[in-house]
């Protein structure tokens, strides 16, 4: 039986690092009071609000004393190629203000409309021509966007 080696896995991370990476958040089904299970064959969010370009994308490695803490453990950033991918998305206070977030997805190769301002990092759904390929999906308990909160999402994806 053939296996995907750690070197092969780190090459997958390297290929992903070279792609435009965005996180989208959405309303999902407005009747949710608790999150539905994520569908492994999902390709899109149910009701997209907007997209945010990744704030930070890097290799990382497991580290019991690491500063990056996610549900799967602690990690440290590294310049060395690894099979662990760190993704961070920091939204501004005004992004999707007043919206209720129930779903998020991380997308590769997101395509934007032409002519948008240089340096823009948050995009309403109508400013995106193609969401791209969904890498991650997570459903949440309803999260109401408040003007006094700056949302930040950290992920470590291990291949």
Predicted regions and their residues:
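Small cysteine-rich, disulfide-bonded extracellular modules of the LU/uPAR three-finger superfamily
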Residues: 1-101, 110-159
């Amino acid at each position: 039986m053939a296996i995907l080696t750690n070197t092969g896995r780190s090459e997958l991370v390297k290929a992903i690092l070279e792609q435009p990476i965005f996180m989208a958040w959405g309303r999902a089904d407005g009747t949710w009071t608790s999150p539905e299970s994520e569908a492994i064959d999902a390709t899109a969010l149910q009701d997209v609000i907007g997209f945010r370009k990744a704030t930070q994308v890097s290799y990382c490695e497991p580290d019991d004393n690491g500063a990056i803490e996610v549900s799967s453990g602690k990690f440290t950033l590294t310049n060395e190629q690894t099979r662990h991918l760190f993704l961070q998305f920091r939204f501004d206070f005004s992004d999707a203000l007043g919206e209720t977030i129930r779903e998020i997805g991380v997308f590769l190769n997101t395509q934007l409309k032409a002519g948008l301002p240089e340096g823009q990092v948050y995009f309403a759904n109508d400013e995106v021509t193609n969401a791209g390929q969904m890498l991650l999906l997570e459903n949440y308990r309803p999260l109401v966007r408040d003007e006094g909160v700056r949302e930040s999402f950290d992920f470590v994806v291990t291949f």
